[in-house]
């Protein structure tokens, strides 16, 4: 079967997948999966030392088979080793903290008919690999190899698709915490920018702030669009919570920062 690759760059600067060094270094002995279960709150995502950006597999929502779900209990990490339902990569997530924060801007690669419900587009996975600054996983439902790496202020994702139609989704309505409020604007055929509200560290509703991002694609997509879904609510008289997002075909790239959008694009 002929394979095709798309490169997704979540970047303030270009990110590079490094070649393996011939001599072993201390970094080669690191196991990023340490602390990813038994409430260790760590994650195996790609991040550099003191880096602002991290790219983390998100597997804590969408499946009744998950051992842990972010909305079923106090939960502070986008990843748990024993969960096996992947709904995308989260960006800017924290590792090793005891309260939920960040872990949003979820990007997901799919194939076949388009669906924007994470319960439907989520998938089981296998062949996880992680090393300092790198993570990869194979998505069973789609036959897609997903890879991620990071620089201090950027990240890059590379997807190897089977032949056929592929999609990359940017879900702004879901994340580790459930703040409502997001905006996305098309800048050109290959670039969008937007804002997402984050915060409520330790479920403190007053601690909310915006994060700004720019998303660029390496190829002009054949089609693109937006979706908005209402989150199900229980025990409230009325509440409006938009589930914003954008879908595009083929390849995308994003910038992430706590600066304004035009400053993000400059980075």
For every predicted segment, state its role:
Residues 1-8:
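Bacterial N-terminal signal peptides that target proteins for export
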Residues 9-17:
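Bacterial N-terminal signal peptides
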Residues 19-23:
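Sec/Tat signal peptide C-region and signal peptidase I cleavage site
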Residues 24-255, 259-260:
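Accessory carbohydrate-recognition regions in carbohydrate-active enzymes
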Residues 258, 265-267:
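Single conserved hydrophobic/aromatic residue that forms the stacking wall/gate
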């Amino acid at each position: 079967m002929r394979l095709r690759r798309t490169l997704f760059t979540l970047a303030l600067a270009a990110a590079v997948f490094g070649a393996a060094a011939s001599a072993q270094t201390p970094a080669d002995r690191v196991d990023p999966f340490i602390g990813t279960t038994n409430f260790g709150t760590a994650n195996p995502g790609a991040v550099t030392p003191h880096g602002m950006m991290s790219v983390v597999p998100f597997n804590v929502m969408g499946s009744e088979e998950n051992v842990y779900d972010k909305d079923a209990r106090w939960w502070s990490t986008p990843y748990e080793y024993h969960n096996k339902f992947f709904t995308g990569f989260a960006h800017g997530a924290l590792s090793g903290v005891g309260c939920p924060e960040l872990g949003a801007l979820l990007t997901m690669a799919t194939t076949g008919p388009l669906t924007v419900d994470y319960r439907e587009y989520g998938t089981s996975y296998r062949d996880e690999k992680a090393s300092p600054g790198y993570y990869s996983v194979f998505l069973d439902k789609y036959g897609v190899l997903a890879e991620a790496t990071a620089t201090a202020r950027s990240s890059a994702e590379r997807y190897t698709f089977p032949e056929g139609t592929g999609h990359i989704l940017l879900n702004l309505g879901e994340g580790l915490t459930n703040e409502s409020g997001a905006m996305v604007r098309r800048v050109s055929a290959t670039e969008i920018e937007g804002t997402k509200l984050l915060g409520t560290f330790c479920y403190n509703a007053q601690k909310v702030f915006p994060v700004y991002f720019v998303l660029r694609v390496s190829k002009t997509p054949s089609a693109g669009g937006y979706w908005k879904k209402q989150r199900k609510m229980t025990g409230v008289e009325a509440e409006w919570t938009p589930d914003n997002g954008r879908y595009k075909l083929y390849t995308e790239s994003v910038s992430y920062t706590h600066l304004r959008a035009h400053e993000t694009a400059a980075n």
